[in-house]
């Protein structure tokens, strides 16, 4: 009997079909963020990173051209079991020599090479307007700016991204999740909290007034509790984005598990959201004391988030994307490690006897529930993971 066969039998004794778990996982798309490979710099300007976010470290090998970034992504993908989508920011537009378009004038043609890359690897594409790292971010504000010229520029950028998102979906044959996030906010206590949010609301409504096929483009709005330089007030708060998505047909909320107070757990928010939203999006990261965007590892909260998605039969309702960036280590390794960590978490959730555990809770057998939860932790998940890697032609960590 092989190691996998022995492990499979142990899981089967608890009613878990590991073969089925592996096949399900292979088909679950997870969006792979290109910005880990170049420290969120992009190709459309030479300025520094803004928007209340930052990368730390100076490890050699940062991708500096589209060709280098694509090559690094291909290298990382060789190490990944399962299905990946490509996640792009608008700042990764690729221009021909002598060509340039500002963000309010971006067109599908500026992303043609990314479409070719995605088709080569049978990937869908998700997209993000880039509301940071640009000279027209005025006083730290974009879509909520009181300066109408500034606000109009960024509204037009959002509309351009709607058109580009639809182009991606039509070309790849897969829906494009388009995420709206800004770092708009104030460093110190504001005199007016409502005004910026009313402008922000109007701006997003104008962006979403751009015609698009709702089956192809999946807009979402992302919240954040604070950022560097915007510690006192963030325009796009959790209450704002949840309310906006609830009241605007076709718009989803997006939760980033690094964008909340450290004692808030997105794993607890996921089932609450599933009670009310037919679908929503998730950015998966690892915050260390704040939204530090450390590389994802198989820690407790990562496992709990995966459990809540799987045990509530929501793999087809939650759009999952990675979002972290670490410049202190090998970037290809960082991208692959985070992807594999999320795959491990999903596999563990798929190999958990969820119905049995739920029955124990519903019948108030809490002592047995604790015992079984602890027993599940000791099951030979490593053998199931090794089988997934082998059947996906992906390297084992030991290699």
Residue ranges: model-predicted function:
Residues 390-399:
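Single conserved hydrophobic/aromatic residue that forms the stacking wall/gate
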Residues 24-36, 51-90:
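Catalytic domains of carbohydrate-active enzymes, especially glycoside hydrolases
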Residues 35-37, 91-93, 130-132, 183-185, ...:
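Active-site beta-loop-alpha junctions enriched in small/polar residues
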Residues 107-132, 136-248, 252:
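Active-site acidic/histidine proton-transfer and metal-coordination neighborhood
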Residues 263-272, 292-302, 330-340:
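Histidine/acidic-residue-rich catalytic or RNA/ligand-binding cores of hydrolases
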Residues 29-40, 77-93, 98, 104-135:
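Glycine-rich, aromatic-flanked loop segments that form ligand/cofactor-binding clefts
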Residues 262-288, 322-324:
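A short alpha/beta connector and helix-capping loop motif
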């Amino acid at each position: 009997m092989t190691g996998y066969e022995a492990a499979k039998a142990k899981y089967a004794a608890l009613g878990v079909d590991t073969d089925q778990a592996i096949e399900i996982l292979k088909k679950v798309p997870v969006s792979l963020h290109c910005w880990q490979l170049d420290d969120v710099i992009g190709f459309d300007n030479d300025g520094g990173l803004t928007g209340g976010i930052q990368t730390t470290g100076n490890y050699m090998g940062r991708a500096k051209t589209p060709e280098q970034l694509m090559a690094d992504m291909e290298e990382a993908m060789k190490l990944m079991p399962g299905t990946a989508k490509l996640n792009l920011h608008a700042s990764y537009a690729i221009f021909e020599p002598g060509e340039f378009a500002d963000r309010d004038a971006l067109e599908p043609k500026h992303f043609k090479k990314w479409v070719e890359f995605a088709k080569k690897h049978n990937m869908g594409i998700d997209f993000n307007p880039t509301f940071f790292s640009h000279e027209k971010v005025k006083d730290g504000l974009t879509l909520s700016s009181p300066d109408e010229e500034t606000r109009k520029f960024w509204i037009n950028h959002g509309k351009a991204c709607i058109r580009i998102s639809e182009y991606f979906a039509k070309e790849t044959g897969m829906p494009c999740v388009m995420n709206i996030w800004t770092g708009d906010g104030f460093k110190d206590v504001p005199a007016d909290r409502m005004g910026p949010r009313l402008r922000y609301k109007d701006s997003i409504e104008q962006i979403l007034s751009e015609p698009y096929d709702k089956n192809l483009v999946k807009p979402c709005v992302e919240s954040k509790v604070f950022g560097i330089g915007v510690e006192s007030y963030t325009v796009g708060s959790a209450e704002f984005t949840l309310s906006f998505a609830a009241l605007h047909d076709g718009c989803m909320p997006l939760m980033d598990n690094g964008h909340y107070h450290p004692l808030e757990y997105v794993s607890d928010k996921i089932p609450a959201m599933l009670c009310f939203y037919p679908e929503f999006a998730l950015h998966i990261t690892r915050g260390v004391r704040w939204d530090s965007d450390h590389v994802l590892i198989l820690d407790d909260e990562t496992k709990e988030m995966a459990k809540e998605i799987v045990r509530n039969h929501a793999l087809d309702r939650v759009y999952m994307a990675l979002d972290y960036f670490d410049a202190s280590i090998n970037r290809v390794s960082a991208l692959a490690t985070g992807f594999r960590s999320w795959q491990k978490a999903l596999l563990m959730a798929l190999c958990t006897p969820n119905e049995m555990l739920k029955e124990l809770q519903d019948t108030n057998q809490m002592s047995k529930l604790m015992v079984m939860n602890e027993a599940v932790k000791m099951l030979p998940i490593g053998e199931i993971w090794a089988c997934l890697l082998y059947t996906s032609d992906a390297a084992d960590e030991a290699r």
